[in-house]
Amino acid sequence: MLISPACWRKFLKPRMATFISDLKAINPRLKIAYHSDGVILPIIPELIEIGVDVLNPIQPAAMDPAEVKRQFGKQLCFWGTIDEQHTLPFGTPADVRREVVARINTIGENGGLILAPTHHVQQDTPMENFWAMAQTITGTPYGSRQYRGHAAGHLSGC
């Protein structure tokens, strides 16, 4: 986090809670996505409390995606999880494929995953790694229409 959890609680949480509450009063089916880089484990329960539905990005270098899923997977959908700091730019295509499959098998279990890099694919990412990610996603059950429908049902539209 760029600010301490205490500062987040004091300055941002009350305003976010009001904003999210107002939005969901207008449309109760609305899904709220929250983006924050780094380690945000201390505030995840409070994000859930104020109405956040989707958490982005879940950086593997900062937080263990499997542990975050274990703790909060029934309340949140996770967007990201493919390591843009190490695996995509510096790994091999085989490393990328292994990571994609691992994320599908752990974070994607029972739905609640929007599988993507943790950030924009950076310029230093080899195209072979980008294509390994894309082809592995689309070549697995996760990339099929049937599975996407199953995953989406996990959080009523996540």
Residue ranges and their predicted role:
Residues 1-158:
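Active-site loop segments of alpha/beta catalytic cores
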